[in-house]
Structure formats: C-alpha cells, structure tokens
A protein has these predicted regions:
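Conserved donor-binding/catalytic core segment of Leloir-type glycosyltransferases
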Residues: 187, 231-249, 255-258
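Acidic anion/phosphate-binding donor-loop and adjacent secondary structure
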Residues: 195-198, 214-229, 278-279
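Nucleotide-activated donor-binding/catalytic signature segment of Leloir-type glycosyltransferases, i.e.
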Residues: 271-297
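Short alpha-helical donor nucleotide-sugar binding micro-motif in glycosyltransferases
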Residues: 298-303, 391
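Aromatic "clamp/platform" in nucleotide-sugar-dependent glycosyltransferases that forms part
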Residues: 311
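Short hydrophobic beta-strand element within catalytic cores of glycosyltransferases
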Residues: 328-331
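Conserved acidic donor-binding segment of nucleotide-sugar-dependent glycosyltransferases
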Residues: 343, 347-354, 363-368
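A charged, aromatic-enriched C-terminal amphipathic alpha-helix characteristic of glycosyltransferases
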Residues: 369-397
Length: 400
C-alpha cells in the first residue's frame, strides 16, 4: 500500500502516533508519505519520507487572514493543490488524516478531491474539532451546539483563534464536503468520543475504536536516584504530567491539594513553564518539559500515585505511561480518561468532585491496594505495537 499520513505536527501526542504508524507500515513493506506544514517546531525535526504542505510564510499569511475572517476554508488553496499533486505522484492508495486544524490546509478542497477519487480515508479523532464548527473540546464548557448548528459559538476566540464567529458556517461546510463520504472511516481512540461522533453530523459513517498505545519498552519500571536527588525519601509523591498546564488539565486542583495535604505528601508537575511557575506555590515541584522519555519513566516510577484531574480529555497516553511504570492512576471521569483505568490499577471519581479525589488520594497512598505488576499488566494491553497493527489491519481492509 501507498499511504499518506497528514497531521499538523510531527511531534507531540498525535505527531508521535502518526510517526509510529508510519514506521510500522514501512517495516511491514508499505510506502508511507508523512505530510505536515512548515512550523518552527516541525522544522526542528528531520522526518524521512516527508512532505511540507506549506511554507512558513504561506502559513503565517493564511493564519492571519483566517483569524480575522473566521473563514478557514477560503485560504491555503495553493498548498492544498500542491499536496493533491504530491499524493497523485506518490500513487496514493489510502489517506490517514490526524489533525487538520491549525491553518495549513483547505479542508473543503481536500475532501472534494478525496470524495471524487474514491480514495479510502481514515480520520483519527484526536480531539473534537472534526465534529464541530470551531472548537477542539466542548466537554469542559458543557456545550451541545455541535449537535445542531454551532450557532453563537461561546469559544470562537479559543484555539483555533478567530476574531469572527463563523462556527455555524464552517459546520455547514463540513456537512457538505465530509458527511456521507462512502470511503471515510472514523477512528476514535476512546469509546467516549466514538459515541459522540455517532451523535454528530457524521452519524452513519463507519466509526471504529483503536486505543492509543505507548512504547512499553521505554515506559517500564525504572530505578533511579530521583527521590534522593530531590530530597523526597519517605514522601508520598503525587505526580501530574501534561503538555500544557492550565485549568482544563486540573492545575487549580494541584494548587488546592498543595494547600491542604500535610507534609507527608510531595506534588510534582511535569510539563510546566516559567509562566506556569509564577502561579505555583513553593510546595509544588515544577519540572519543565523533558524530551528524555527514559527520564520521564524514572519520574513515573518514583511516584506513588499518578493524579489526572483533567476536565477535557480524549484517551490520555500519560495514564498508560504511568501504569506501564508500575504507578496507579487516579482520574476524574472525563472523556476517555476512565477507559484506561480498571479496578486492578487505579480509581475514578466524578468530574470536579474534589472531595472524592482527595479522599482517594489519602486511601490509595495509605492502603496501597494496587500492585506495580497489575498496573503494568493493564498497560501492556495498550501498547504502540497493538495500536499500529490495528491501523495496518484497518488500512488493508479498506484498500482491498
């Protein structure tokens, strides 16, 4: 098969998944073309067999115009035309789309071409943007307008930022160009989002569930001197990990915990920044983004409990990474986050039930009901290898 993979980034969670799938397909004898725009972060990484959909200048100009008009569909025609020509020259058999938002492609033009050619398309729902007229997550604000028309969008100034509320128009365009595509298959990493997709304008589309997976060879129980280096011997370590910290990821919950838990506890947050540090109490140990995954595995291993009080989530790989390192998980019942946890490896409490979360922290760190072995056993059901094999199986099915 000749497979084209398209994503906004070649790094981060979705970018890593895209590259993992690409590497797996190549190892299985398939040809893969990985496509993404020329952003600062993307240009830092050399990716084999890749194609830059647009230049930085094209993206910056289109981004400014899109923000001020709210008409993401009107721009990036030339980059999309070049992408289509590249796919035709490549001899594409199937297209795997990840994140299309982010100012780099003209989605009506792309889907019009894919529909006309009857090319099998797999679209992985890394967030809720494919279902809405604008936002990437509606769970945190309790908005249900995506089920009808997205008129009067309450978050149109949020990512992808716009100065004009054009959400209703963009949702109509998605209905026009995407709904009813016979060769389209949606893949959700969680049962939660698959259910929501079935309630959207995409109901009737073939919807599958393929859980995200992690590298269990990297994320495994890892002995280190982390506790002694940080002066945390004998402490009950609560750990949180996120790409971007804020209220959606429960930063305020950790701040509150720091003010209420006694000195037996230590709180560590990974993935912070100088800006986040300004609002943190001294009790919270802040570790900025680490690119060393083995170092991260050592931090997961050193923790007594991984706490994920997220308010908007799809299927968080951080939960799986913690389990793979033998650390139990405590999470809010948000999105697909609870699907990672079963009774052998952690606990789930109602979303925003702070008192229940705190009570579970005290219980789990005192009773220690979850063994490291049972945590890792659960994580081994959600590996990168299984995820990639499931995607290869699906692509073969659609092409054949």
């Amino acid at each position: 098969m000749n497979v084209v993979e398209i994503n906004l980034y070649n790094y981060g969670s979705a970018g890593k998944i895209m590259l993992d799938i690409g590497a797996h397909l190549r190892a299985a004898g398939h040809s893969v073309l990985v496509c993404y725009p020329a952003t600062g972060g993307n240009l830092k990484r050399k990716v084999p067999d890749s194609y830059r959909i647009c230049t930085r200048v094209e993206r910056n100009i289109g981004m400014i115009l899109s923000k001020w008009t709210g008409c993401e569909d009107l721009f990036f025609r030339l980059p999309t035309w070049r992408l289509i020509r590249k796919m035709e020259h490549f001899g594409v058999d199937a297209v795997h789309i990840h994140c299309l938002l982010g100012w780099y492609v003209n989605f009506p033009m792309l889907f019009r071409y894919l529909r006309r050619k009857g090319i099998p398309v797999v679209w992985t729902l890394h967030d809720c943007w494919p279902l809405t007229g604008h936002c990437t997550h509606f769970d945190g604000i309790g908005c249900g307008k995506w089920k009808s028309d997205c008129r009067g969008c309450p978050v149109y100034r949020g990512f992808p930022e716009s100065r004009v509320d054009n959400a209703a128009r963009l949702l109509r365009l998605k209905r026009k160009y995407i709904a009813g595509m016979p060769a389209l298959t949606l893949v959700s990493p969680s049962e939660w989002l698959a259910d929501l997709a079935g309630q959207s304008y995409l109901k009737g589309t073939d919807i599958r569930v393929i859980h995200n997976g992690i590298d269990a060879e990297v994320f495994r129980p890892t002995e280190s001197d982390f506790r002694s280096r940080r002066g945390l011997e004998g402490k009950r370590i609560l750990l949180g990990v996120a790409m971007a910290w804020g209220r959606p990821k429960g930063l305020d919950v950790f701040v509150r915990l720091a003010g209420e838990l006694d000195d037996r506890f230590a709180i560590i947050l990974v993935g912070t920044s100088d800006e986040v540090d300004e609002g943190l109490p001294e009790r919270i140990i802040s570790i900025h983004q680490t690119m060393d995954r083995k170092e991260l595995a050592a931090i997961y291993t050193a923790a007594d409990l991984f706490v994920n009080p997220t308010r908007q989530e799809n299927f968080p790989t951080v939960n799986i990474e913690a389990l793979a390192c033998g650390t139990p998980v405590l999470t809010y019942r948000t999105g697909g986050s609870p699907e990672v946890v079963d009774p052998t490896c952690g606990s789930v409490v109602a979303k925003d039930d702070y008192d229940a979360l705190k009570a579970e922290i005290l219980r789990i760190t005192e009773e220690r009901p979850f063994s490291g072995a049972s945590c890792r056993e659960r994580a081994l059901q959600l590996t990168r290898e299984k995820m990639c094999a499931d995607y290869e199986r699906l692509l073969r099915e659609l092409v054949q």
